[in-house]
Amino acid sequence: AYDLDGSRGIRNPKGMYGNQLRVQLHLVSVAHGAFRNLLSCLSRCDLDLEAPVISAYASGLACLVEDEKDLGVTLIDMGCGGTGLATFSGGELIWTATVPIGGAHVTNDIAHGLTTPIASAEHMKRLFASAIGGPADNREMIEVPQLGEPELLSARQIPRALLTGIVRPRLEETFELVRDYIDSSGVAIASTRRIVLTGGASQLQGVGDLAAEILEKQVRLARPLPIQGMAEAVAGPNCATCAGLLLYAAEHHGEPQIRRQTRDPHPPQPAGGALGRIGQWLRANF
């Protein structure tokens, strides 16, 4: 935000007149070696970097509404290799951090705990994993392929409660670290009172409830807000960063064809009698 002659909170001073212009900046530092390695990977793919954008910020662009960014919110992007944090207030990014635990760590815990291949562990995580156990978990059985053996012949059955017992501790550790990072950030309480969860790992059952329990804050599960032309298959929380990068390119690098969906992507069709009204109800509710 800019400060012009003592007037604070100015987002864009272009066209304004004054004697003294100040600006408050948020700087993000990254490991030099890791950044150079990413540039090298892009170069080998014959791609050029237009601008670096921190992933949690991009996810915030995709998932947060303007009122949230104005009033104060912290976004938690639960990615594969890490969990990104981004706090917005007054419409601007004011704090970022990264917790070095992500969805891949949960997958590895399942693979080690159940002695199963990584692919099978990922499959079980997506279909059966839960952060909070249920009353039927001890009775519900899951087939677990064994490492290094034929999948159909070696599968053994375990109760779903065992899988929950493996997954929950890692998620608890993640949110406890998130809580510690937020508490030590020095950011105003109002900006961290509301939490928005997104990212692939946020899709695990019960994650929102566990986050609210540990962080003791209001939690909303989010997916990218509709972008015109974006397919439904790539509009989930796991694609939040990609959607945010598209919006960033549209705003900063002149891509007018990329814009938010301003109307219902599936507008109701004219009803034709009773059957038409039934079809309209099904489209609206399912």
Task: Describe the function of each predicted region.
Residues 30, 129-133, 190-214:
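Glycine-rich phosphate-binding loops at beta-strand->alpha-helix junctions
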Residues 214-242:
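Conserved phosphate-binding/catalytic loops in two-lobed NTP-binding clefts
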Residues 78, 87-89, 97-98, 146, ...:
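Active-site proximal loops enriched in glycine and acidic residues that flank catalytic Cys/His/Asp
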Residues 108, 161, 165, 169-176, ...:
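Feature representing long, continuous alpha-helical segments
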Residues 42, 77, 110, 178, ...:
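Residue-level signature of catalytic and energy-coupling elements of molecular machines
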Residues 25, 71-113:
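Glycine-rich phosphate-binding loop of actin/hexokinase-like ATP-binding domains
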Residues 1-74, 92-93, 116-164, 185-188, ...:
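Nucleotide/phosphate-binding catalytic cleft detector across ATP-hydrolyzing
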Residues 175, 179-193:
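Phosphate/pyrophosphate-binding loops at sites that engage ATP/ADP/AMP, CoA/4′-phosphopantetheine
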